[in-house]
From Swiss-Prot:
Post-translational modification: Activated by autophosphorylation. Protein phosphatase 1 represses autophosphorylation and activation of isoform 1 by dephosphorylation. Phosphorylation by STK3/MST2 is necessary for its localization to the centrosome.
Coiled-coil residue spans: 303-361, 403-427
Domain Protein kinase: 8-271
Descriptive protein name: Serine/threonine-protein kinase Nek2
Native source organism of the sequence: Mus musculus (Mouse)
Source taxonomy: Eukaryota, Metazoa, Chordata, Craniata, Vertebrata
Function text: Protein kinase which is involved in the control of centrosome separation and bipolar spindle formation in mitotic cells and chromatin condensation in meiotic cells. Regulates centrosome separation (essential for the formation of bipolar spindles and high-fidelity chromosome separation) by phosphorylating centrosomal proteins such as CROCC, CEP250 and NINL, resulting in their displacement from the centrosomes. Regulates kinetochore microtubule attachment stability in mitosis via phosphorylation of NDC80.
Pfam family, one: Pkinase
């Protein structure tokens, strides 16, 4: 039996969608809180009616945890009003989240931005998939106001009023629709719209989540179109990682064939862990719905990915243990080197002490004046004649004078040599002091 308007209780109005009013309602049968979109199709043109039918059919076909769930539709032919009953997202939309961040002057956490990116990309993957008859769904109006959050801040993509189904034999849609701030360069140039146009809009949305403003702004649509075709925009705030900035920059590439696909985005290392977690949760939900335990088959690509992650973690643990062993070995080597340095320092101090004693001893010996070797000429045998004579007296005086002069010269030479040795010892002492400081520096 089809549902009636009387089966629901209107609680209050939430806002206005693309072509109608949204109201929060309660289903009387079980008290479940839902929302319906109230649309007056009597005032619509044939094109608008066609778009309305398209949205209803899409909502019935698209079933994904990150897409707003469709529950029912009610046709009031008397008042030419269509009610589309959908899931209620009590977390509001991303537009209100951005407005709050702008008002509070507080940026959103990168973890939240990455989670939004992951869940939105998974929703777009469901839309862009070429299965179930080869249909591809383009959202064509991806913006913060059309992305909703549930009570746990999970993303829900909604408002498919502008979406259009593409078949295999029709690769592009050419209708000029969408929100100007998020329109792609090909839309601004009146070119064909494809899956990569949704990727551009996703990049604009993620950019606005980070910067709290769109990447391209202008006072009129002509100026905005020029800026979008030029493709220049500022980097997202530096509080966000380079990886996130690079991925958003790739999404906002002027050439659509250079933009990443949904599969390439999901394969990014930046969100690989989040993707695996979302896929695991989705499988658990399916298991609960079917009443079977949520076991993954061995052939499941998700299980293979989880096993790969586990192996990678084990490899990282082994690498960390190996690094710990290396660090312990280095610590032992440092202890040995420290002991060797202490031994070298003790030997150096002992050598310095011995050299100091030797220096003092040698200086004392030089000051005492050891016996001097006389020259060979002074050692000639003297001729003695008995009795005193003038010759003998003169020779004796000359010998004494010669000996005194020779001794003086020899003493000067020895004093000079002692000074040279003292200087050499001082240099040696300085050298050992320097070596001692170097040894201490090794510690």
């Amino acid at each position: 039996m089809p549902s009636r308007v009387e089966d629901y209780e209107v609680l209050h109005s939430i806002g206005t969608g693309s072509y109608g009013r949204c109201q929060k309602i309660r289903r009387k049968s079980d008290g479940k809180i839902l929302v319906w979109k109230e649309l007056d199709y009597g005032s619509m043109t044939e094109v608008e009616k066609q778009m309305l039918v398209s949205e209803v059919n899409l909502l019935r076909e698209l079933k994904h945890p990150n897409i707003v769930s469709y529950y029912d539709r009610i046709i009031d032919r008397t008042n030419t009003t269509l009610y589309i009953v959908m899931e209620y997202c009590e977390g509001g939309d991303l537009a209100s989240v951005i407005s709050k961040g702008t008002k509070d002057r507080q940026y959103l956490e990168e973890e939240f931005v990455l989670r939004v990116m992951t869940q939105l990309t998974l929703a777009l993957k469901e839309c862009h998939r070429r299965s179930d008859g080869g249909h591809t769904v383009l959202h064509r109006d991806l913006k913060p106001a059309n992305v909703f959050l549930d009570s746990k801040h999970n993303v829900k993509l909604g408002d498919f009023g502008l979406a259009r189904i593409l078949n295999h034999d029709t690769s592009f849609a050419k209708t000029f629709v969408g929100t100007p701030y998020y329109m792609s360069p090909e839309q601004m140039s009146c070119l064909s719209y494809n899956e990569k146009s949704d990727i551009w809009s996703l990049g604009c949305l993620l950019y606005e989540l980070c910067a709290l403003m769109p990447p391209f702004t202008a006072f009129n649509q002509k100026e905005l179109a020029g800026k979008i075709r030029e493709g220049r925009f500022r980097r997202i705030p530096y509080r966000y990682s380079d990886g996130l900035n690079d991925l958003i920059t790739r999404m906002l590439n002027l050439k659509d064939y250079h933009r990443p696909s949904v599969e390439e985005i999901l394969e990014s290392p930046l969100i690989a862990d989040l993707v695996a977690e979302e896929q695991r949760r989705n499988l658990e939900r399916r298991g609960r719905r079917s009443g079977e335990p949520s076991k993954l088959p061995d052939s499941s690509p998700v299980l293979s990915e989880l096993k790969l992650k586990e192996r990678q973690l084990q490899d990282r643990e082994q690498a960390l243990r190996a690094r710990e062993d290396i660090l312990e070995q280095k610590e032992r080597e440092l202890c040995i080197r420290e002991r060797l340095a202490e031994d070298k320092l003790a030997r150096a101090e002992s050598l310095m002490k011995n050299y100091s004693l030797l220096k003092e001893h040698r200086l004392l010996c030089l000051a005492g004046g050891p016996e001097l070797d006389l020259p060979s000429s002074a050692m000639k045998k003297k001729v003695h004649f008995h009795g005193e004579s003038k010759e003998n007296t003169a020779r004796s005086e000359n010998s004494e004078s010669y000996l005194a002069k020779s001794k003086c010269r020899d003493l000067k030479k020895r004093l000079h040599a002692a000074q040279l040795r003292a200087q050499a010892l001082a240099d040696i002492e300085k050298n050992y002091q320097l070596k001692s400081r170097q040894i201490l520096g090794m510690r």
